[in-house]
A protein has these predicted regions:
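Positively charged n-region of N-terminal signal peptides that target proteins for export
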Residues: 1-4
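Bacterial N-terminal signal peptides
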Residues: 6-16
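Alpha-helical interaction segments
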Residues: 14-15, 75, 140-141
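Selective for proline/serine-rich intrinsically disordered segments
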Residues: 15-17, 137, 260
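Acidic, serine/threonine-rich low-complexity disordered tracts
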Residues: 21-124, 158-265
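Hydrophobic, well-structured mid-protein blocks that either form specific transmembrane helices
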Residues: 114-156
Length: 265
């Protein structure tokens, strides 16, 4: 479940030229907005092990006068399974609305007896990450694991050919890692929230980086302007762990990739 929490979200940096007269870049965004909520079932085969959600606050918060999205990602094991392995993971990013880059990041992990609390403040002007574990140099517009996911949703994924690799950078655990995302093609899948046309992508995993090379991760994103995650599949030695979309609300616009709704099946 920890890898699901990491991967669902693990994509992306693409440097765009700064508009004349502007201090920071501007990234067009039709994918998401205030108040969006995405809900998921996390399970193994036919067993539901937990729930997860992405939530954008309905109102902006501000960093140095710049409007920002206040975004949370949470994964929780079912209370009925807490005796076996209790999970309460929470991630937060403060994401610049105009530039789609992070100003702040929090990570609170509770998995069994393991606990970790980490926070970072990104000085995007001076390219530094000031964290609870020290201060580190970063490249321009570096991302955390949550902001990277939202940034990649703004990209025109339909313009990439099958097999193309999007190169990106992500700050994690005291370092900035180079990661790639391979475009695998298109597929139609059915989940609890309906039947969707999707673009399938694969984060390219490197040992010691954001993910461990324990298995393949595949992500299905809706093949429309919203590019919401419909499914995340992680292979493990004994099978596959899946996170599947069960519900959504507050979308920025229509979800044209949905072919059928749950009620029409």
């Amino acid at each position: 479940m920890k890898r699901i929490a990491s991967c669902v979200a693990t994509l992306a940096l693409s440097i765009l030229p700064l508009p004349a007269g502007e201090e920071f870049r501007y990234v067009p965004n039709e994918a998401f907005g205030y108040g969006e909520r995405l809900e998921f079932r996390v399970g193994y085969k036919f067993i539901t092990a937990g729930r997860a959600y992405f939530q954008i606050a309905p109102e902006p918060i501000y960093h140095e006068g710049r409007p920002c999205y206040d975004i949370w990602f949470e994964v929780r094991s079912l209370e009925s399974l807490d005796w076996l392995y209790r999970v309460r993971d929470r991630y937060r990013t403060v994401l610049d609305v105009a530039g789609i880059f992070p100003w702040e990041f929090e990570q609170h992990i509770r998995e069994g007896n393991f606990r970790r609390d980490f926070s970072a403040r990104f000085d995007q002007r001076n390219r530094k990450a000031i964290t609870t574990e020290g201060t580190f140099d970063t490249p321009p517009y570096v991302h955390d694991i949550v902001s990277a996911f939202y940034y990649v949703r703004t990209l025109d994924l339909r313009s990439y050919q099958k097999g193309a690799i999007v190169q990106l950078q992500n700050f994690f655990d005291r370092q900035t890692y180079d990661l790639g995302v391979r475009i695998l093609g298109r597929q139609t899948i059915e989940v609890a929230a309906g039947t969707f046309r999707c673009i399938v992508v694969e984060p390219l995993i490197r040992e010691g980086g954001l993910f461990k090379s324990e298995g393949r991760i595949l992500i299905w994103l809706s093949d429309d302007d919203r590019k919401i995650p419909v499914k995340v599949s992680t292979k493990i030695p004994i099978g596959t762990i899946d996170a599947e979309l069960t519900g959504y609300s507050g979308l920025r616009g229509p979800l044209s990739a949905r072919i059928t709704s749950p009620d029409s099946r």
